[in-house]
Amino acid sequence: MQKAVRVFVLLFSILVVIVILSLWKKAERKNAIAELESRFGAQISIQEKEFYLGCSSPELKDLKELASLVKRVGEPDILDLTGSPSLVTLAGVEDLPSLTSVVAIDCPSLVTVEGVSGLPALTQLAFTDSAQLTDVSVIRDLPNLVTLDLSGCVGITSLDLQGLPALENLYLSRCRQLKALDLSAFPGLRQLYTDGCAGLTTIDGLGALANLTDLDVSNASGLTGLPGVEKLAELIVLDLRNLEIEDLSGIARLPKLRVLRMGGQEKIETLEPLSSLASLRELHLEACPNLRSLKGIPTGVSQYAGFTYCPKLVSLEGIEAAGGLEHLDVTGCENLAEVGPVAKLSSLVQISLVKCRLVKAVPFVEKLPKLRIVMLGGSGVVPVSVEGLPLANEELIFDFTISE
């Protein structure tokens, strides 16, 4: 009997200790949350499967004290430091190994991301528009990192990243001082954005990116070519605006390319170099000063074709080859006069002839039953001239506004 009593007392004592510890832990957590909110203005959201912490306090210079408080609350998944004006370093973040995402967008004082190396669960890092950030070599040994966004980090001159085997998305938009890029360490990349990297002169290892689907090198005006581009068998979207490419043969060999954006290329006179792009559905050509003919347009272009501000384009002859085209935009083609071939685009839904001053009439509206919108602002067509026209689609809208 006495033995049973002792066992009961022992079990009861253990239960009391557990209850006390539980109450203490709840109080400790509550106090930590209160301090995070009062001292750092933290925003805390704890859902069933996600612990989010947002903080942009001017008191925040590093993460050491913040991390100490956060650990008393739990294991955070997402740390959002966007807009923190005084944050200089991420030192202290290493004490939060449960983090899957660290976001520090527009942190004007951030100069180092010390502490992120080796965080085992991290899948996303975003330091967009943190202009003082120059050294990112400490971003390494992150086995699960999928997305790295350094867009607008204008101080970065080189990229020495190691130990990122899972990296799929690399965003370097507007890193204007970045000189060279070696992609050999990132064979799994799916998206690469270097748009606006005016100082970039070479991209090595491009041809080895067998899984790349999106490539944006627009306004990376220091590049003179894209060696290896023809090997990008999975590429779907390619943006080359304001990048002078001497040889388009590699691009013409991309079997899955669906969207091609180009602009400012002086070498393009016709679309014949692109005619082999059987999967292409959208074609954007902007301000190509010598484009004179649409002959050779890939026949599969159906969702959108735009040839805007091309001063030598005088006729739309050749466009009829893209018989399934739904949206045609020739805005700003000041010398365009002949639009008759549009009548053969039986699937056309919208056309823009804005600022095409030599276009005086739109007889094609009589033959296109799917056409819904004709944009004519600043063209040579006057409103009175379309009154009473027999329309294939009685609900057709003529829009004479000019949008800048």
Question: For the regions a protein language model found, what residue spans apply to each?
Answer:
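Ser/Thr/Pro/Gly-rich low-complexity linker/stalk segments immediately outside membranes or between
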Residues: 24-39
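Hydrophobic alpha-helical membrane-insertion segments, chiefly the h-region
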Residues: 14-23
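Concave beta-strand-loop units of leucine-rich repeat
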Residues: 49-62, 68-88, 92-111, 115-134, ...
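Charge-rich, solvent-exposed alpha-helical interaction surfaces
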Residues: 32-35, 65, 69
